[in-house]
Amino acid sequence: MSQSGSVLRRNGFTFKQFFVAHDRCAMKVGTDGILLGAWAPVADVKRILDIGTGSGLLALMLAQRTDDNVPIDAVELDAGAAMQAQENVAHSPWPHRITVHTDDIQSWAPRQTVRFDLIISNPPYYEPGVECATPQREQARYTATLDHQTLLAIAADCITEDGFFCVVLPEQIGNAFTQQALNMGWHLRLRTDVAENEARLPHRVLLAFSPQAGECFSDRLVIRGSDQHYSESYTALTQAFYLFM
């Protein structure tokens, strides 16, 4: 049985340590989220914020990667997705660490009295245009409810002085997002350009920004080798999560 056929069941995705149901979420578990959750720097992290958690995928991946005393706040605007995220968390090994908030990040963030040293988001990136099949999918895919400038401003208000704000975006949109972040005082510290294989140009980019200036480390990740199997670098990054890797 293929990997995709053996890990997809009951409208969800089974990882080594947890299961993510996503049938009530506009955006399903996919490579973008898995890449971001496996890639984000977690050294010395003390508190995590997941903006737009959806099914709870990123919060769960980061719970697996961090110490048991690290709390994670996961904020989701869509009530159906937030409820499913709560269920996924409840059935995971970390229900005591992850709190799912059904709220708009723009109203939730100003009420917080603590700051986060890791903020993570798989944000919407399409400009409003062609309508989606459902309002929930439109909300998840389009920037009308949370544009990038607002997202960057919220992250700036919530982050510690030496924290990281991490996102995954399509390559060209990521370049524009980076320029916007730099204009707002952020510093780009990590960048990984992601290509499907060696013959193709990068189609996604993983970005980590910080309020603190410092050297920017950049590299390239290829998902599949010439034999169409996962590359060594992609395997090393994600093997703690995929069942059959």
Curated annotation (Swiss-Prot):
HAMAP family: tRNA_methyltr_YfiC
Entry keyword set: Cytoplasm, Methyltransferase, S-adenosyl-L-methionine, Transferase, tRNA processing
Recorded GO MF terms: nucleic acid binding; tRNA (adenine-N6)-methyltransferase activity
InterPro entries noted in UniProt: DNA_methylase_N6_adenine_CS, SAM-dependent_MTases_sf, Small_mtfrase_dom, tRNA_Adenine-N(6)_MTase, tRNA_adenine-N6_MeTrfase
Subcellular location: Cytoplasm
EC number(s) stated in the UniProt entry for this protein: 2.1.1.223
Cellular compartments per GO CC: cytoplasm
Function recorded in the entry: Specifically methylates the adenine in position 37 of tRNA(1)(Val) (anticodon cmo5UAC).
Tree of life domain: Bacteria
Pfam families, per the entry: MTS
Presence of the UniProt keyword Methyltransferase in the record: yes
Descriptive protein name: tRNA1(Val) (adenine(37)-N6)-methyltransferase
One of the GO BP terms on file: methylation
Coiled coil: none
Catalytic activity: adenosine(37) in tRNA1(Val) + S-adenosyl-L-methionine = N(6)-methyladenosine(37) in tRNA1(Val) + S-adenosyl-L-homocysteine + H(+)
Nucleotide-binding listed as a keyword: no
PROSITE patterns according to UniProt: N6_MTASE
SUPFAM superfamilies in the cross-refs: S-adenosyl-L-methionine-dependent methyltransferases
Family per similarity comment: Belongs to the methyltransferase superfamily. tRNA (adenine-N(6)-)-methyltransferase family.
